[in-house]
A protein has these predicted regions:
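Conserved short alpha-helical segments that host acidic/polar catalytic motifs at enzyme active sites
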Residues: 1-178
Length: 178
């Protein structure tokens, strides 16, 4: 990490959750709801962020150059850790200063660009919360589906995650969001 990143680096903790649930999809939805509940309960704490909570995906978040990833996360150098796919994003700040909460990746995508209709998109997604109900994922207890305070890419990632966990396939979800 550079000096700016180190001076503002949050406390990073990893947790591992084990389940007796044979249905990995159901377990993933349960973890999503647990994460949403914790985010709602701690929304007054702007530094609280859950990078990932999934039986399938492992997330790392850092305000760091690619060449320094192994220093920040030494477990990435372990040969027994293998991945079928990796999403990496190096943020080139356009109109905001680099900050840990804005560092990518988010949970489902990495997006580079400006979404100029962010407020409208957030309102659109929350207005359709009841329209896109899924028997697989009950989000009725939450006031909002997407982050109201994060970056434009974070809100897009929230919406994509919600559609996928609700049972929609990736191509259809992406068509809706584009």
């Amino acid at each position: 990490c550079g000096r700016l990143a180190q001076s503002s680096m949050p406390r990073i903790q990893q947790v591992f959750v084990e389940s007796d649930e044979a249905d990995t999809d159901a377990f993933e939805r349960a973890l999503f709801l647990a994460r949403k509940r914790s985010e709602d309960a701690l929304q007054a704490h702007p530094d609280f962020h859950v990078v990932g909570l999934s039986p399938r995906l492992l997330g790392y978040k850092g305000m760091v150059l690619p060449s320094h990833l192994r220093q920040l996360f030494p477990d990435l150098a372990r040969p027994e850790l293998e991945a079928r796919a990796v999403v990496f994003h190096q943020r080139f700040s356009t109109n905001t200063l680099p900050r840990w909460p804005l560092a990518h990746p988010f949970r489902r995508l990495a997006h580079n660009g400006e979404i100029n209709t962010i407020e409208g998109n957030r309102c659109w997604s929350n207005a359709r919360k009841d329209v896109w109900r899924s028997p697989l994922l009950d989000v009725a207890e939450f006031d909002t589906v997407v982050s109201q305070h994060g970056s434009d890419s974070q809100s897009l990632d929230n919406m994509l995650e919600w559609l996928l966990l609700g049972g929609m396939d990736l191509p259809k979800a992406m068509r809706i969001l584009m």
